[in-house]
Design a protein with these regions (language model features):
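Residue-level recognition of tetratricopeptide repeat
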Residues: 32, 36, 70, 104, ...
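Canonical positions in the second alpha-helix
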Residues: 53-54, 87-88, 122, 129, ...
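Terminal, low-structured helical/coil segments at or just beyond the last alpha-helical repeat
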Residues: 148-197
């Protein structure tokens, strides 16, 4: 589930690795290897340092920020994780994936009203994208943000009537599994998706 936050933040956002400094990509990749299985704080702190180096080399490198958020969450530093998330805003003001992640991070930090505003904005942006050029990732995350916004588990069948033939069976099953988990333990699932232990 940890990798889902990367999907939420980065899928459908072209951060074009070719345009990112190779040294920044290398530092980010080193941070991922260093973090390993998120088992010890020394490795996580080293991974945060490497993420900071990647960000210093390439301030718009969203994946480095997303990884740093995961490492901070694994250390239980959710306020710092929120501040890191908010640093990405200038690079992603209209990116529904970023706004969804921001909403979850705000909710994790007990800022429910701001989180709800973010969920509403993300839902609107996903709707626009689904009307223009629908993708599996957009629909999957649209269903997810609807649940977070309305605290209601919508039927995939109903949503797929409006947006038919987008989800493959495997992605549909994954989406349904996440939604089933959410309906029982919303806070736990959000915490886990953000990289918290």
């Amino acid at each position: 589930m940890r990798t889902l936050i990367i999907l939420l933040l980065c899928t459908s956002t072209s951060f074009a690795i070719a345009q990112i400094s190779p040294k920044a990509v290398e530092k980010n990749n080193q941070s991922v290897k260093t973090a390993g299985f998120f088992n010890d704080s020394d490795s996580l702190n080293k991974a945060i340092h490497l993420s900071d180096e990647a960000i210093a080399l390439e301030p718009s490198y969203k994946l480095a920020y997303a990884n740093k958020v995961k490492y901070l969450m694994a250390l239980g530093q959710k306020e710092k994780a929120l501040q890191t998330m908010l640093q990405m805003e200038k690079f992603s003001p209209d990116d529904p994936y970023y706004i969804l992640g921001k909403g979850m991070m705000l909710e994790e930090n007990a800022k429910k009203s701001l989180a709800m505003d973010a969920y509403k904005q993300a839902a609107s942006l996903f709707e626009k994208r689904l009307k223009e050029k629908p993708t599996e990732a957009d629909l999957m995350n649209y269903v997810f943000v609807l649940f977070l916004r309305d605290n209601k588990n919508y039927s995939l069948d109903e949503i797929e009537k409006e947006y038919p033939k987008i989800l493959t069976p495997s992605v549909r099953q994954l989406t349904k599994g996440v939604m089933d988990k959410l309906s029982n333990k919303r806070e736990d699932v959000i915490h886990e998706m953000l990289g918290g232990k």
